[in-house]
Protein backbone atom coordinates (compact mmCIF):
# COMPACT_ATOMS: atom_id res chain seq x y z
CA UNK A 1 0.00 0.00 0.00
CA UNK A 2 1.25 3.49 -0.91
CA UNK A 3 0.05 6.28 1.38
CA UNK A 4 0.11 9.90 0.18
CA UNK A 5 -0.88 12.58 2.68
CA UNK A 6 -0.17 16.20 3.57
CA UNK A 7 0.62 14.79 7.00
CA UNK A 8 -1.99 16.62 9.06
CA UNK A 9 -3.26 13.42 10.69
CA UNK A 10 -0.10 11.35 10.42
CA UNK A 11 0.97 11.84 14.06
CA UNK A 12 -2.33 10.31 15.17
CA UNK A 13 -1.90 7.29 12.87
CA UNK A 14 1.79 6.63 13.47
CA UNK A 15 1.22 3.74 15.88
CA UNK A 16 -1.07 1.88 13.45
CA UNK A 17 1.35 2.51 10.59
CA UNK A 18 4.24 1.03 12.56
CA UNK A 19 2.16 -2.02 13.52
CA UNK A 20 1.09 -2.65 9.91
CA UNK A 21 4.36 -1.56 8.28
CA UNK A 22 4.82 -4.90 6.51
CA UNK A 23 2.05 -4.02 4.01
CA UNK A 24 3.10 -0.38 3.48
CA UNK A 25 5.46 0.26 0.58
CA UNK A 26 5.91 4.02 1.03
CA UNK A 27 4.50 7.00 2.88
CA UNK A 28 4.65 10.26 0.94
CA UNK A 29 4.31 13.45 2.97
CA UNK A 30 4.80 17.18 2.41
CA UNK A 31 7.17 19.34 4.43
CA UNK A 32 7.53 22.82 2.95
CA UNK A 33 9.39 24.57 5.73
CA UNK A 34 11.27 24.11 8.98
CA UNK A 35 9.59 24.90 12.32
CA UNK A 36 11.12 28.37 12.73
CA UNK A 37 9.50 29.55 9.46
CA UNK A 38 6.25 27.62 9.85
CA UNK A 39 3.96 30.35 11.18
CA UNK A 40 5.19 32.86 8.62
CA UNK A 41 4.58 30.44 5.74
CA UNK A 42 1.04 29.33 6.58
CA UNK A 43 -0.16 32.96 6.76
CA UNK A 44 0.16 33.01 2.97
CA UNK A 45 -0.25 29.38 1.87
CA UNK A 46 -3.11 28.63 4.31
CA UNK A 47 -1.82 25.04 4.47
CA UNK A 48 -1.42 24.00 8.08
CA UNK A 49 0.38 20.85 9.14
CA UNK A 50 2.46 20.86 12.29
CA UNK A 51 6.01 20.69 10.98
CA UNK A 52 7.58 19.79 14.33
CA UNK A 53 5.25 16.81 14.68
CA UNK A 54 5.81 15.78 11.05
CA UNK A 55 9.58 15.84 11.46
CA UNK A 56 9.29 13.76 14.63
CA UNK A 57 7.04 11.22 12.89
CA UNK A 58 9.43 11.09 9.92
CA UNK A 59 12.23 10.18 12.31
CA UNK A 60 10.05 7.47 13.87
CA UNK A 61 8.99 5.93 10.55
CA UNK A 62 12.55 5.86 9.23
CA UNK A 63 13.66 4.16 12.45
CA UNK A 64 11.15 1.36 11.80
CA UNK A 65 12.43 0.93 8.22
CA UNK A 66 9.35 2.41 6.57
CA UNK A 67 10.07 4.14 3.26
CA UNK A 68 9.34 7.86 3.61
CA UNK A 69 9.10 10.13 0.58
CA UNK A 70 9.25 13.77 1.68
CA UNK A 71 8.04 16.28 -0.88
CA UNK A 72 8.86 19.98 -0.69
CA UNK A 73 7.19 22.40 -3.09
CA UNK A 74 8.97 25.71 -3.46
CA UNK A 75 7.61 29.16 -4.16
CA UNK A 76 8.67 32.68 -3.23
CA UNK A 77 7.69 32.11 0.42
CA UNK A 78 10.03 29.22 1.13
CA UNK A 79 12.72 29.17 -1.59
CA UNK A 80 15.23 30.54 0.91
CA UNK A 81 14.50 27.42 2.99
CA UNK A 82 15.86 24.97 0.42
CA UNK A 83 19.41 24.88 1.75
CA UNK A 84 18.39 24.90 5.44
CA UNK A 85 16.02 21.97 4.80
CA UNK A 86 18.77 20.13 2.94
CA UNK A 87 21.22 20.66 5.81
CA UNK A 88 18.59 19.54 8.34
CA UNK A 89 18.11 16.24 6.49
CA UNK A 90 21.87 15.90 5.98
CA UNK A 91 22.66 16.49 9.66
CA UNK A 92 20.03 13.91 10.63
CA UNK A 93 21.82 11.39 8.42
CA UNK A 94 18.74 10.86 6.25
CA UNK A 95 20.62 10.93 2.95
CA UNK A 96 22.52 7.82 4.00
CA UNK A 97 19.29 5.92 4.71
CA UNK A 98 17.93 3.59 2.01
CA UNK A 99 14.34 4.30 3.04
CA UNK A 100 14.45 8.11 2.74
CA UNK A 101 13.76 10.20 -0.37
CA UNK A 102 13.49 13.97 -0.78
CA UNK A 103 11.51 15.11 -3.80
CA UNK A 104 11.70 18.76 -4.78
CA UNK A 105 8.76 20.34 -6.59
CA UNK A 106 7.66 23.77 -7.77
CA UNK A 107 4.38 25.50 -7.05
CA UNK A 108 2.66 26.35 -10.35
CA UNK A 109 -0.67 27.47 -11.79
CA UNK A 110 -1.28 25.20 -14.76
CA UNK A 111 -4.94 26.15 -15.17
CA UNK A 112 -4.43 29.87 -14.49
CA UNK A 113 -7.05 29.82 -11.75
CA UNK A 114 -5.24 30.15 -8.41
CA UNK A 115 -4.32 33.84 -8.44
CA UNK A 116 -0.96 32.82 -6.99
CA UNK A 117 1.22 34.29 -9.75
CA UNK A 118 3.22 36.71 -7.59
CA UNK A 119 4.50 33.84 -5.40
CA UNK A 120 5.54 31.45 -8.19
CA UNK A 121 9.26 31.03 -8.87
CA UNK A 122 10.90 29.70 -12.02
CA UNK A 123 12.66 26.40 -12.58
CA UNK A 124 15.87 28.40 -12.84
CA UNK A 125 15.34 29.99 -9.41
CA UNK A 126 15.17 26.55 -7.79
CA UNK A 127 18.06 25.17 -9.85
CA UNK A 128 20.29 28.04 -8.72
CA UNK A 129 19.61 27.05 -5.11
CA UNK A 130 20.20 23.35 -5.81
CA UNK A 131 23.52 24.16 -7.43
CA UNK A 132 24.71 25.39 -4.02
CA UNK A 133 24.35 21.89 -2.54
CA UNK A 134 27.77 20.29 -1.92
CA UNK A 135 28.77 17.57 -4.36
CA UNK A 136 28.24 14.71 -4.69
CA UNK A 137 24.50 15.28 -4.68
CA UNK A 138 22.78 12.50 -2.66
CA UNK A 139 21.20 9.86 -4.88
CA UNK A 140 17.97 10.03 -2.86
CA UNK A 141 17.51 13.75 -3.53
CA UNK A 142 15.23 14.06 -6.55
CA UNK A 143 14.18 17.07 -8.58
CA UNK A 144 10.60 16.78 -9.77
CA UNK A 145 10.06 20.15 -11.42
CA UNK A 146 12.46 20.45 -14.38
CA UNK A 147 10.44 20.54 -17.60
CA UNK A 148 11.17 23.57 -19.78
CA UNK A 149 14.93 23.17 -19.30
CA UNK A 150 15.21 19.38 -18.93
CA UNK A 151 16.86 18.65 -22.29
CA UNK A 152 19.64 21.07 -21.39
CA UNK A 153 20.01 20.22 -17.69
CA UNK A 154 20.59 16.60 -18.74
CA UNK A 155 23.51 17.68 -20.91
CA UNK A 156 24.93 19.87 -18.13
CA UNK A 157 24.50 17.14 -15.49
CA UNK A 158 22.18 19.46 -13.57
CA UNK A 159 18.99 17.40 -13.49
CA UNK A 160 19.49 16.40 -9.84
CA UNK A 161 18.20 12.84 -10.17
CA UNK A 162 14.95 14.07 -11.73
CA UNK A 163 12.42 11.36 -10.93
CA UNK A 164 9.59 11.79 -13.48
CA UNK A 165 10.45 10.29 -16.87
CA UNK A 166 9.62 12.47 -19.87
CA UNK A 167 10.28 12.07 -23.57
CA UNK A 168 12.80 14.26 -25.39
CA UNK A 169 10.08 16.26 -27.15
CA UNK A 170 7.45 15.97 -24.41
CA UNK A 171 6.91 18.55 -21.67
CA UNK A 172 6.27 16.18 -18.75
CA UNK A 173 5.62 12.56 -17.83
CA UNK A 174 1.85 13.08 -18.22
CA UNK A 175 2.07 13.62 -22.01
CA UNK A 176 4.98 11.21 -22.53
CA UNK A 177 4.45 7.61 -23.71
CA UNK A 178 6.39 5.90 -20.91
CA UNK A 179 4.89 5.88 -17.40
CA UNK A 180 1.44 4.31 -17.24
CA UNK A 181 0.31 6.08 -14.06
CA UNK A 182 -3.25 7.05 -13.22
CA UNK A 183 -5.02 8.61 -10.25
CA UNK A 184 -8.30 7.18 -9.00
CA UNK A 185 -10.84 9.06 -6.88
CA UNK A 186 -13.35 7.58 -4.43
CA UNK A 187 -15.86 7.03 -7.25
CA UNK A 188 -13.26 5.09 -9.28
CA UNK A 189 -12.93 7.91 -11.83
CA UNK A 190 -9.55 7.98 -13.56
CA UNK A 191 -7.27 10.97 -14.04
CA UNK A 192 -3.85 11.16 -15.62
CA UNK A 193 -2.33 14.36 -14.19
CA UNK A 194 -2.20 15.45 -10.54
CA UNK A 195 -3.51 18.90 -11.53
CA UNK A 196 -6.69 17.40 -13.01
CA UNK A 197 -7.70 15.18 -10.08
CA UNK A 198 -11.17 16.12 -8.84
CA UNK A 199 -12.06 18.14 -11.95
CA UNK A 200 -14.95 16.43 -13.79
CA UNK A 201 -13.97 17.78 -17.22
CA UNK A 202 -10.69 15.84 -17.05
CA UNK A 203 -12.12 12.42 -16.13
CA UNK A 204 -10.71 9.81 -18.50
CA UNK A 205 -13.37 7.27 -17.62
CA UNK A 206 -14.22 4.92 -14.81
CA UNK A 207 -12.18 1.99 -13.59
CA UNK A 208 -15.27 -0.21 -13.91
CA UNK A 209 -15.40 0.42 -17.66
CA UNK A 210 -11.78 0.95 -18.76
CA UNK A 211 -9.26 -1.82 -19.41
CA UNK A 212 -6.15 -0.14 -18.03
CA UNK A 213 -3.89 -2.86 -19.38
CA UNK A 214 -4.76 -1.80 -22.93
CA UNK A 215 -5.67 1.87 -22.39
CA UNK A 216 -3.54 4.32 -24.38
CA UNK A 217 -3.28 7.76 -22.81
CA UNK A 218 -2.91 10.87 -24.94
CA UNK A 219 0.61 12.06 -25.70
CA UNK A 220 1.71 15.51 -26.80
CA UNK A 221 4.95 17.09 -27.99
CA UNK A 222 6.03 20.40 -29.50
CA UNK A 223 5.63 18.76 -32.92
CA UNK A 224 1.86 18.90 -32.37
CA UNK A 225 1.90 22.71 -32.27
CA UNK A 226 2.63 24.54 -35.53
CA UNK A 227 3.70 27.67 -33.63
CA UNK A 228 6.35 25.68 -31.74
CA UNK A 229 7.95 24.53 -34.97
CA UNK A 230 8.77 28.10 -36.01
CA UNK A 231 9.53 29.42 -32.51
CA UNK A 232 12.94 31.04 -31.97
CA UNK A 233 13.74 28.72 -29.03
CA UNK A 234 13.42 25.76 -31.36
CA UNK A 235 11.00 23.60 -29.38
CA UNK A 236 13.32 23.28 -26.38
CA UNK A 237 10.38 23.85 -24.02
CA UNK A 238 8.69 20.81 -25.63
CA UNK A 239 5.51 22.76 -26.24
CA UNK A 240 4.80 23.68 -22.64
CA UNK A 241 2.04 22.31 -20.43
CA UNK A 242 -0.86 20.92 -22.46
CA UNK A 243 -3.39 21.99 -19.83
CA UNK A 244 -2.13 25.57 -19.93
CA UNK A 245 -1.94 25.55 -23.73
CA UNK A 246 -5.57 24.44 -24.00
CA UNK A 247 -6.66 27.39 -21.86
CA UNK A 248 -4.38 30.15 -23.19
CA UNK A 249 -1.68 29.05 -25.62
CA UNK A 250 -0.19 32.52 -26.06
CA UNK A 251 0.13 33.11 -22.31
CA UNK A 252 1.79 29.76 -21.61
CA UNK A 253 4.04 30.24 -24.66
CA UNK A 254 5.30 33.57 -23.33
CA UNK A 255 5.87 31.98 -19.91
CA UNK A 256 7.93 29.18 -21.46
CA UNK A 257 10.03 31.61 -23.51
CA UNK A 258 10.69 33.68 -20.41
CA UNK A 259 11.68 30.56 -18.44
CA UNK A 260 13.98 29.34 -21.21
CA UNK A 261 15.69 32.71 -21.66
CA UNK A 262 16.24 33.05 -17.90
CA UNK A 263 17.84 29.61 -17.83
CA UNK A 264 20.10 30.56 -20.74
CA UNK A 265 21.29 33.76 -19.07
CA UNK A 266 21.59 32.53 -15.48
CA UNK A 267 22.81 28.95 -15.95
CA UNK A 268 23.62 27.74 -19.47
CA UNK A 269 25.93 30.55 -20.60
CA UNK A 270 27.89 30.68 -17.29
CA UNK A 271 28.18 26.87 -17.33
CA UNK A 272 29.47 26.81 -20.91
CA UNK A 273 31.98 29.55 -20.12
CA UNK A 274 33.15 27.65 -17.07
CA UNK A 275 33.54 24.44 -19.03
CA UNK A 276 35.50 26.26 -21.73
CA UNK A 277 37.48 28.10 -19.06
CA UNK A 278 36.62 31.43 -20.67
CA UNK A 279 35.37 34.66 -19.16
CA UNK A 280 34.36 36.60 -22.28
Predicted regions and their residues:
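A structural signal for well-ordered alpha-helical scaffolds and beta->alpha junctions
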Residues: 51-54, 82, 119-130, 224, ...
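Amphipathic, soluble alpha/beta structural segments
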Residues: 65, 79-91, 154-180, 224-250
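Radical SAM/AdoMet-radical enzyme domain recognition
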Residues: 1-107
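Flexible mid-to-C-terminal extensions adjoining Fe-S/redox cofactors in radical SAM and related proteins
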Residues: 189-190, 194-280
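Flexible loop/turn segments at secondary-structure boundaries
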Residues: 9-11, 36-37, 77-79, 109-112, ...
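A C-terminal junction/extension of Radical SAM enzymes
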Residues: 97, 108-199, 236
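Short, flexible, glycine/charge-rich loop motifs used to bind or transfer phosphoryl groups or to couple energy/partner
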Residues: 16-18, 171-172, 218-221
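Residues immediately flanking
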Residues: 31, 186, 233
Amino acid sequence: IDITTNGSFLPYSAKKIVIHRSIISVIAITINTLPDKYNETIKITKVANNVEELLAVTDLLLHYHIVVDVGTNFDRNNLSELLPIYHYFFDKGYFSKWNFHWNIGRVDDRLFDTGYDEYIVSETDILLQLMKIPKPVPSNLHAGFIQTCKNLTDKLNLSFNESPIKGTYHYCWNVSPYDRVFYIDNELNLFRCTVTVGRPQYILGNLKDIDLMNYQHETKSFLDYKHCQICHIGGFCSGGCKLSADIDFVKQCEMEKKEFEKFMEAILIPQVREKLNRND
